[in-house]
Amino acid sequence: MEKRIVCLAGDGVGPEVMESAKEVLHMVERLYGHHFHLQDEHFGGVAIDLTGQPLPQRTLAACLASDAVLLGAVGGPRWDGAKERPEKGLLALRKGLGVFANVRPVTVESATAHLSPLKKADEIDFVVVRELTGGIYFSYPKERTDEVATDTLTYHRHEIERIVSCAFQLASKRKKKVTSIDKANVLESSKLWRIVTEEVALRYPDVELEHILVDAAAMELIRNPGRFDVIVTENLFGDILSDEASVLAGSLGMLPSASHAEKGPSLYEPIHGSAPDIAGKNKANPIAMMRSVAMMLGQSFGLTREGCAIEEAISAVLKSGKCTADIGGTETTTSFTKAVMQEMEEQALVGRGR
C-alpha cells in the first residue's frame, strides 16, 4: 500500500513525538511492505514565526491533498502576546478539513493501572465520540453587552444523524453498546438529539442503546466507567466529558484521538498539549502519538493488523517495566520508541515462524 501523510510537528514536544511516529511508520513499511510518503509542513506557533499565520495556505492545501494528517502538538506561552494564537490554527484546520467527529479511545494498560485515580482501572475500555462542528460553540446569534451575554445552541437533524451513525458503526465492531449523552429533560436540542438517535438505532438492531443525562454521565464515568463502550454526545458535553475521561488513564501522554470528515483526510493527534517545560529534553511520552499512528493505519487505511502490531508492542514494552518519567519510569522519548520498534520486529519474526 502507498499513502501520503502530512506531518504537522507543531510546537513544544510536537517535533519529538512526531519523530517517534515517523520511526514507527518506517518500521511498518519495512515489516509489511507498505510505502508512506511523509510530507512535513509548518503549523501552529512555528508557522506564525515563519509566515505570520498558524495555518498557512500551503499547509492546508497539502493536508487536503493527503490521505491522512498527523499532528504533534500546538501552542505555548511563547505566543501568548502574539497577534495570532497558535490554537487558532487548529480550529481553522478542523474547519478546512471538514472534520465533524472526534474519536477518543480511553483504555488503561494493566501495567499502568496503578496510575489511574480509580480502583479497578484495568476494566476501563471505551470510546468517546464527540460532535465537532455544531452546538453552542458554532451557533448564532452570539452577543455580549455590559449587562447581558447570549450564546445559542443549535443542532440540525443531519448533524446529529451523521455523528450518531459514526458511533453505532464503531460500536458494531466493539462490544455493541452505545451510550448517548444529552440533557433532554431541559434542552430542546437534546430532545431532537434523542429522537434522531432512536431513529438511527433502528438500523443497528444488534447494538444496544442507552440514554444518560449529562450530569449523571459525569458521575458514572468516575463511579462505574466499565459500563461504557461507545459514548456519543454533542460538542460542549463532549468537550467536558472527554477531558474528564482522559484523566482515568493516569497520564495524558497515553491517549490518542482522531477527527473524521465525511469525505477527505482524517486528522490524528495525541490529546496532550505541547508541554513546553520539557520540550527539547527528550522526556516526552511518545505513546499517545504512536497510538495515533495505529488509529490512522486502522481507521483511514484499513491496515488493522499493522495498527494492532503497534498497540501490542507498546503493551509488551510497558509490561516489561519500561516507561517514561510521566508514568514513573526512566526511559527517554527515543529509548522508549526504540524499545517499541524492537518489540514490533520481534513479534513479526515470531509471527512468521509460526
UniProtKB/Swiss-Prot annotation:
GO cellular component: cytosol
Quaternary structure note: Homodimer.
Gene3D superfamilies listed in its UniProt record: Isopropylmalate Dehydrogenase
Repressor listed as a keyword: no
Catalytic activity: (2R,3S)-3-isopropylmalate + NAD(+) = 4-methyl-2-oxopentanoate + CO2 + NADH
Signal sequence segment: none
Name of the protein this chain belongs to: 3-isopropylmalate dehydrogenase
Organism: Bacillus anthracis
HAMAP family per UniProt: LeuB_type1 (MF_01033)
